[in-house]
């Protein structure tokens, strides 16, 4: 059983994956709030409470964090609480198997890397990956499995909250799909702007990538969405063909397996 930990700016996803290779399957997934000042002890208490008896069946762990301070605590947690469980954390120097054809590879978020790796592995073609999180990342992987770059826009919830915070007449609203693109009250107007506006933003970016990037205009390009807020916008997206809620967890598994294979079938346990 592999423990997968995906730490983002606002929320953290913890998953359990059984099997490996083509037989791997996410059997459990939880979503908890990310606390930037969380300690290793607090993380261990939370995760151990989630996975329960499966803690005794762990054969490996793989994690990433877009919050550097939390990545350190994840490392300490694994070393202290599961010292005999081999682990891989996605950071510079770790083999991901995906070349980063960008100006500064160290700037590329680990989440973007593993998403593109998972999409390329699953579909075997060039791909455009749209991750709906606190930011919307639209990333591009070539038919050779190379990370070409991407575009980053503010996330749906972040943008809606910012509009409410900066405007005296607006308030924070629940993000649900409105009855119409034409709102009949302030709440519906904000919901329409968020849902239909971001659907248009994503479709526009995907279409522009198809038009501007060599090799992406044909039908042999997979367009994949993932992320917690993706289902809110999916019904109104015209360019996205696939939705995979476990894409990042699958990418974490692939990196773990790749590093395990590179060390002749066994990673060194934490010391």
Swiss-Prot record:
Substrate binds at residues 109-112, 186. Pfam families: Pan_kinase (PF03309). Keywords: ATP-binding, Coenzyme A biosynthesis, Cytoplasm, Kinase, Metal-binding, Nucleotide-binding, Potassium, Transferase. ATP binds at residues 6-13, 134. Its EC number is 2.7.1.33. It is an enzyme of class 2 (transferase). It comes from the Bacteria. Signal peptide: none annotated. SUPFAM superfamilies: Actin-like ATPase domain. A monovalent cation. Ammonium or potassium. GO terms for biological process: coenzyme A biosynthetic process. GO terms for molecular function: ATP binding; metal ion binding; pantothenate kinase activity. K(+) binds at residue 131. The active site is at residue 111. The keyword Kinase applies. One of its GO terms (cellular component) is cytoplasm. Gene3D superfamilies: 3.30.420.40. It catalyses: (R)-pantothenate + ATP = (R)-4'-phosphopantothenate + ADP + H(+). Pathway: Cofactor biosynthesis; coenzyme A biosynthesis; CoA from (R)-pantothenate: step 1/5. It is found in: Cytoplasm. Catalyzes the phosphorylation of pantothenate (Pan), the first step in CoA biosynthesis. Belongs to the type III pantothenate kinase family. Homodimer. HAMAP family: Pantothen_kinase_3. This is Type III pantothenate kinase. The lineage of its organism: Bacteria, Bacillati, Actinomycetota, Actinomycetes, Mycobacteriales.
């Amino acid at each position: 059983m592999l423990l997968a930990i995906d730490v983002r700016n606002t929320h953290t996803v913890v998953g359990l994956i059984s099997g490996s290779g083509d037989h791997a399957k996410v059997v459990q997934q939880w979503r908890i709030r990310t606390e930037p000042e969380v300690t290793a002890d607090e993380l261990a208490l939370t995760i151990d409470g989630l996975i329960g008896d499966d803690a005794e069946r762990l054969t490996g762990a793989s994690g990433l964090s877009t919050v550097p301070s939390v990545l350190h605590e994840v490392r300490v947690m694994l070393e202290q609480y599961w010292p005999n469980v081999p682990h891989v954390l996605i950071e510079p120097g770790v083999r991901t198997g995906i070349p980063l054809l960008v100006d500064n590879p160290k700037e590329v978020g680990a989440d973007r890397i593993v998403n593109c790796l998972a999409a390329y592995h699953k579909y075997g073609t060039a791909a455009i990956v749209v991750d709906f999180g606190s930011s919307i990342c639209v990333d591009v992987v070539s038919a050779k499995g190379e990370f070409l770059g991407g575009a980053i826009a503010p996330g749906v919830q972040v943008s809606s909250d910012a509009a409410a915070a900066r405007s005296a007449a607006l308030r924070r609203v629940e993000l649900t799909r409105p009855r119409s693109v034409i709102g009949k009250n302030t709440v519906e107007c904000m919901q329409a702007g968020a849902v239909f506006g971001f659907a248009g933003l994503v479709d526009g970016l995907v279409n522009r990538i198809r038009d501007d990037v060599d090799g992406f205009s044909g039908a042999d390009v997979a367009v994949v969405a993932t992320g917690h807020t993706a289902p809110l916008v999916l019904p109104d997206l015209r360019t996205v063909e696939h939705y995979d809620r476990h894409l990042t967890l699958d990418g974490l598994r692939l990196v773990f397996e790749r590093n395990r294979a590179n060390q002749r079938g066994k990673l060194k346990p934490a010391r």
